[in-house]
């Protein structure tokens, strides 16, 4: 880990069907904080990001899932992979480090209900 904390890219997923997402980079992330604390931190930060369109700022995000870990293979999915949910969706009570988050990890942040709907019928609308 970097001395000042880790750099983590969070992909805000607004729509799975329309592949509508925006990446946000967080520097100095404490990997020993809980997933729940990081979710609160991101949700508090999103409305203040000038570069984000309004629909991203007002969306209800509640779930983090690992998309890519450093030195690992990337998925072919354009938004987020639909496999390995048990391993890759971060449990709110554990720490980021315990969940497998490291420096330069890429996470997806989305509404769990929308993810389940898309997973049941993974059809893109564009």
UniProtKB/Swiss-Prot annotation:
Q: Which residues form a coiled coil?
A: none
Matching Pfam families: DUF2340
Query: What family is it from?
Result: Belongs to the UPF0538 family.
Entry protein name: UPF0538 protein C2orf76 homolog
Q: Which organism is it from?
A: Xenopus tropicalis (Western clawed frog)
